[in-house]
């Protein structure tokens, strides 16, 4: 059972005062290298180079931010209208800063995020889709920023007064950046056959799993997609008489289609 490719391959971590390196070199032994070697044997095994040929198009950056005192949480609460220390839903999803040069988004899930998390601290997640653009406050590309600088940009968009931003980023938070060169590789343009079938025709002893294997009707970027490919692989190769759960047929349900239209227009009438 082969997981071909890998969205998190070559991911690197920085620190509060260090940049996360942008490491794009595909080295022997990884998921992309293995898939390339398999694909060289037969076209039925897909075309990995369609997905990993240009990390400039498939990368983005994320960061975890831990608040260390009571200075930042009020700004989070002001935007999400919920007490982040309540133990209940905080942001209720991601908050996207639409006019951010990095297209910055952030979220705080139900706290504490970790069992051993100190009381009075929050752990949140920040990410930016345009890692090569200068920030609105930090005039550097996101990929060239330390954790502290990413935090400063985020605090700027939270509405923190500019004369307090640097001090708060340095002393009221610890921010760890992560660069992911291939994180959206599965969204790269592709053609039929670029992803191999879960069980290629004629295969009797191996199958492909995960986001770069082809299964019917489902959409990548979900855990369900990976699980469905694994179920299909196991049931097929081991001749297990069980059906893989159907993908929800929303594309054929007029109620779902109408609701999607409303959501895409933010509830505005046509």
In which residue ranges do the predicted regions lie?
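Acidic, Ser/Thr-rich low-complexity intrinsically disordered segments
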Residues: 253-270
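C-terminal segments that line or cap access tunnels to active or ligand-binding sites in enzymes
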Residues: 2, 9-252
């Amino acid at each position: 059972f082969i997981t071909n490719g890998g969205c998190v391959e070559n991911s690197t971590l920085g620190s509060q005062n260090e940049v996360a390196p942008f490491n794009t070199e595909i080295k022997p032994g990884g998921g992309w290298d293995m898939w390339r070697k398999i694909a060289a044997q037969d076209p039925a095994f897909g075309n990995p180079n369609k997905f990993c040929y240009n990390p400039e198009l498939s990368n983005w950056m994320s960061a975890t931010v831990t608040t260390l005192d009571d200075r930042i949480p009020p700004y989070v609460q002001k935007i999400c209208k919920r007490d982040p220390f309540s133990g209940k839903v905080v942001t209720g999803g991601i908050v996207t800063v639409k006019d951010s040069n990095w297209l910055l988004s952030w979220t705080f899930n139900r706290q504490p995020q970790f069992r051993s998390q100190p009381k009075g601290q929050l752990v949140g997640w920040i990410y930016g889709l345009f890692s090569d653009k200068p920030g609105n406050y930090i005039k550097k590309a996101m990929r060239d920023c330390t954790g502290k600088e990413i935090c400063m940009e985020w605090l700027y968009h939270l509405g923190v007064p500019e004369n307090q931003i640097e001090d708060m980023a340095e002393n009221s938070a610890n921010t760890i950046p992560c660069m992911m060169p291939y994180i959206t590789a599965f969204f790269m343009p592709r053609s039929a056959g670029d992803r191999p079938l879960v069980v290629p025709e004629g295969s009797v002893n191996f199958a492909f799993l995960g986001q770069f294997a082809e299964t019917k009707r489902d959409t990548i970027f979900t855990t369900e997609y990976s699980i469905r490919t694994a179920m299909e692989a196991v049931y097929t190769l081991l001749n297990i008489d069980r059906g893989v759960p159907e993908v929800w047929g929303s594309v054929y349900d007029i109620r779902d289609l109408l609701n999607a239209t409303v959501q895409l227009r933010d509830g505005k009438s046509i």
